Structure formats: C-alpha cells, structure tokens
Amino acid sequence: MNDPQQSNKDAHEDPQTTPYELIGGASSLKAITEEFYALMDTQPNYKELRAVHGPDLGRAQERLFWFLSGWLGGPALYVEKVGSPMLRARHLPFPIGEIERDQWVTCMVEAMTRQGVDEATRDRLAPHFYKTADWMRNKAEDPAP
C-alpha cells in the first residue's frame, strides 16, 4: 500500500474480498482493537508504546477501530466522524521511534492472533501495518554503537 490513508485493498489476493471481510468485519475488528489496547496496557514488552498514550486508552481505541474499518476496506467510519485521517500530522505530538513502531506492529499481530485471524491474513496485513507504522516515526534515533 502506497498511501496509508487509502483503503488497504492490496493486502490480500482476491480483489473481491477486502481485508475487512477477511478478518471478520466490524465485530472482529472491534475485538482486535480491544485486544490490542488490553495487551498494550498490561504487557511489559509494550511499555514504550504504552508510554506515548495518555492514561485513558478509550478514545484511542475507538479512533483506531474507526480508522482501521476504512483502511481495511470496510465503512469509512473515521472519515465520517472526524474527517481526513491525516495520520502523520495527528501523530506528530507523540514521540514515535523504531521501538514504538516495532511494538505497535507486534502488538497488532498478537491481537489478531489472539482473536483468531488466520495466519495467511496476518501475514498479508503485517507488512502494511509495518509500512504505516514506519511512516509515523518522528523521533530521532540514537546511532547504533
């Protein structure tokens, strides 16, 4: 996917089936986003990712659900409720580096796994999640020793 703000229709092989449908639609996506934030909030291996979020994850969870709905080829809830996602601009206030990027992608894949998304679909979506998360990076990284 070239533009993270566009539908993610190239994340699967069948052009008639969207990733939104492949993961099971709204109810499955809702469960995935709930699992994602529960993992982030409770698992120490996501502590840096958790630290860039405020104390209440409810708003972020709701907005991620809205965004992913449209991004995965389902209803464009975020656009309907908020307007253009402007992902990078909306994330600039939050320090996002390689650690946060990697934790975000790992947490999302773990959430999809726990919610029963099949391996083939996870494997198709993971690179698109990575590309989008990488595009969010805005923090200077220390050079490798």
Residue ranges and their predicted role:
Residues 2-145:
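Core of compact, soluble alpha-helical bundle domains
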